Design a protein with these regions (language model features):
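Conserved catalytic alpha/beta core of Sir2/sirtuin-type deacylases, generalized to analogous enzyme cores
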Residues: 1-156
Length: 156
């Protein structure tokens, strides 16, 4: 299971935000890609909030405007339940491309849970930022390489 605690590039949200809903953006993004010219998207394709009319933005935790909608809370509860039920078992805390923008959300908790669970392992793939604390070094794999290439190599 995946929990996009930091957001999802596949969702729009109001840039204000005037409400706590997100919207699937795949169709709109594909249309933007198809119709862009000279690296510009036609202004009529720029998404607008259906409630207040302000521009929409990606659903990413970049500042205090991040929208946590019903789906986010449902996924957060699933994640919490998983950790409660399986956090003492053999588990791999896999981190893909997590930097130091908000390390307290993913990185530090993963390190902490790895240190506290003798059966846990930590792995990160992040070009330029693959590291772990000395305390969990013996049960960690840090790959300082391009994620896309690593996944292609793993999948053969």
């Amino acid at each position: 299971r995946l929990f996009y605690t930091q957001g999802d590039y596949g969702l729009w949200q109001c840039s204000e935000p005037c409400h706590q809903n997100t919207y699937d953006n795949e169709e709109a993004v594909r249309r933007m890609l198809a119709e862009q010219r000279d690296m510009k998207v036609p202004s009529e394709l720029v998404p607008r909030c259906p409630v207040c009319g302000k521009p929409m933005s990606m659903n990413l935790r970049a500042d205090n405007t991040f929208v946590q909608d019903e789906g986010w809370y449902t996924a957060a509860a699933r994640y919490s339940d998983f950790l409660h039920q399986h956090g003492h078992e053999a588990v791999l805390f896999l981190e893909l491309g997590v930097g130091y923008n908000t390390p307290g959300i993913i990185k530090y908790p993963f390190w902490q849970m790895t240190a506290q669970n003798s059966k846990a392992a930590y792995a990160c793939i992040n070009y330029g930022e693959a590291a772990c604390p000395e305390e969990i070094e013996s049960k960690s794999i840090c790959i300082n390489y391009n994620i896309e290439q690593v996944l292609k190599d793993l999948l053969g």
